[in-house]
Amino acid sequence: MLILAFESSAKAASVALCRDGELLSEYTQCTTLTHSRTLLPMGEDMLKNAELTLNDVDLIAVAHGPGSFTGIRIGVSMVKGLAWALDKPCVGVSTLEAMAWHGLSAGGLVCPVMDARRSQVYNALFSIENGRPVRLTEDRPISLDDLAQELGSYDWPAFLAGDGAEMSYDYLTKKGVDCVLAPENLRMQSAWGVAMAARDKEPGTADSLLPVYLRLSQAERERLERLEREAAEKKE
């Protein structure tokens, strides 16, 4: 199976091409350009250099969240459009599950962390069993205090990956948590991880592909807070 995978949940844009679990090509770009300008041209260029076309692709995969609200919307919308136009199956995978594939060489406990702001990280925990990540928790926003307490119950050191890894490492080590910071080449999100995670997912259609945000955006939170204030003022 030839999988074309996209990752746009954070600052870097990443595109990968995998056939039956083997990485054929991966492009990553981390610039000031928006994902809406870089993601699709990267994919088209990569396919061209591999002497392939979009019609050769069997499955289109994308990291559907959690992560940057804007980045996720761009990636999911683009893949929905491609899948619809080409009549191809597509699938969304957890950004955190995709990152867990970076911990294969470390083994033990893999702890992807993304900076969720508001004193929280997006996180899930995985163990490495038989050469693949096995989920231990659901994706969730969690405070570093709560994460430190949870990691303390495991016998393995936690392998930290993701754009929140360095921040989390500094905090967790001060709390006495046994953890390892992923090397820079394994720390950031990658489309290779998306492709690997997609192999076990049930393919869907463009209509079934949806973003996963885990919590409201800042604009939605502010709107809800404003409505609550207005409702309280009316009661007075």
Q: Where do the model's predicted regions map?
A:
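N-terminal beta-alpha supersecondary unit
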Residues: 1-66, 141
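Acyltransferase
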Residues: 180-236
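Residues at secondary-structure transition points
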Residues: 30-38, 69, 73, 77, ...
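Surface "functional belts" at beta-alpha junctions
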Residues: 22, 34, 89-188, 218, ...
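DPxDG-like acidic metal-binding loop motif
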Residues: 61-90, 95
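Conserved hydrophobic/aromatic positions in well-ordered beta-strands
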Residues: 16, 122-126, 212
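Stable alpha-helical structural segments in soluble proteins, enriched in small hydrophobic residues
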Residues: 46-50, 85, 103, 191-202
